[in-house]
Amino acid sequence: MKAVSVIVDSCVIFPMPLCDTLLCAAEAELYCVHFSQEILDGATRNLVKKGRMTEFKAARFQEMIKNTFPEAMVEVPASLVEAMTNHPGDRHVLAAAIIANAKIIVTDNLKHFPKKALEPYWIEAQHPDVFLTQLFDNDPESIVEVIRQQAEELKKPPLTVAELIDNLEKNNRVPEFVSRVRLYEYCNLVIETAKKALTVLGTPAAEGGRSYEGGRYRLWMKGQTLTITAKDSRGEILRVQNMEIEGSISSEDVKLFQIFAQRLEQELATNGVE
């Protein structure tokens, strides 16, 4: 199946962790990315203005994008831009989408792309959270592998997968995508730690099965159903039932379960329990 063609607006190229994820996903051929020169200029102009890059580095950044995606650039005639009816500041983006035969414009500025202006061209504007979440739903392992590879290639500073996910979470830019990626990447760690804790430390529960009351979480398991409930305002954060996993775990949850797993291993080793 041919990857969908997408125009990426300058406003989502500007935040670097998000830009990297979008470009890495395109490099992995999860979608076909397109830009115009005006879109790239808008992105690098903001990067220079905010002090994130010098003019020289901005030029090299553009060159890198063009070299990585040689088929991505589209030339947009001024006459087509003038014919667009969306927000004047982003008419060049819609025109670029038409030239690229793109089906989606990924943008933070959804209000600049009203449906009425896009429908004649069968184009949809999507928030980056919606777009990345759709990529996840289509192929979870591939998009999570993109995140793993992205983390592996970051050197200044080096980042773990967990730290990269935390960076994407900042400013609440792509919350649903982050939630799904984190659960996919770390659910096995959390679930196996919970099961081990219930086996070693759990006691019979009033509702049947076994439970463990920790300082921050209540673990409960009966048959093939496992729940983890946070002792804060969130309530249940993870449920395994009928071979399906549902929930939303935070960065702090992952860290605490990693520590808990280490302590369990130490306790088992000390007590000689397998």
Give the residues covered by each predicted segment:
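PIN-domain endoribonuclease scaffold, especially VapC-family toxins
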Residues: 34-77, 144, 150-172
